[in-house]
């Protein structure tokens, strides 16, 4: 019989429109995990989602004249293995920018 040890893992998903702000947030999370003796893997880049909006330039006629706008959503995943209570407490107190969406799964 083989015995498998269940290892705790925290998966953090980050989303942002600004890539630089997202990378700074990832660096802060990894630095916090490293200072509390937890092993962090990542950031793993996920595919960037592009959403394109087409808008008519003129309010009345000239449907041939259109303008395109796009939003790009950059995404990253960070896995933290064997977190301690100190690691979780430090991650909860971490101050991250408001433009970064964070989703945490235990």
UniProtKB/Swiss-Prot annotation:
Part of the 30S ribosomal subunit. This is Small ribosomal subunit protein uS10. It comes from Synechococcus sp. (strain CC9902). GO terms for molecular function: structural constituent of ribosome; tRNA binding. SUPFAM superfamilies: Ribosomal protein S10. The keyword Ribosomal protein applies. Belongs to the universal ribosomal protein uS10 family. It comes from the Bacteria. Pfam families: Ribosomal_S10. Signal peptide: none annotated. Keywords: Ribonucleoprotein, Ribosomal protein. Involved in the binding of tRNA to the ribosomes. NCBIfam families: PRK00596.1 (NF001861), rpsJ_bact (TIGR01049). GO terms for biological process: translation. InterPro entries: Ribosomal_uS10 (IPR001848), Ribosomal_uS10_dom (IPR027486), Ribosomal_uS10_dom_sf (IPR036838).
């Amino acid at each position: 019989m083989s015995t498998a040890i269940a290892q705790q893992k925290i998966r953090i998903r980050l989303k942002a429109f600004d890539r630089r702000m997202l990378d700074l947030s990832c660096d802060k999370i990894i630095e916090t995990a490293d200072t509390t003796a937890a092993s962090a893997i990542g950031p793993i880049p996920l595919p960037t989602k592009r959403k394109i909006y087409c808008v008519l330039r003129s309010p009345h006629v000239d449907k041939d004249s259109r303008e395109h706008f796009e939003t790009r959503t950059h995404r990253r995943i960070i896995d933290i293995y064997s977190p301690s209570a100190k690691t979780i407490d430090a991650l909860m107190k971490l101050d991250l920018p408001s433009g970064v969406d964070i989703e945490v799964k235990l």
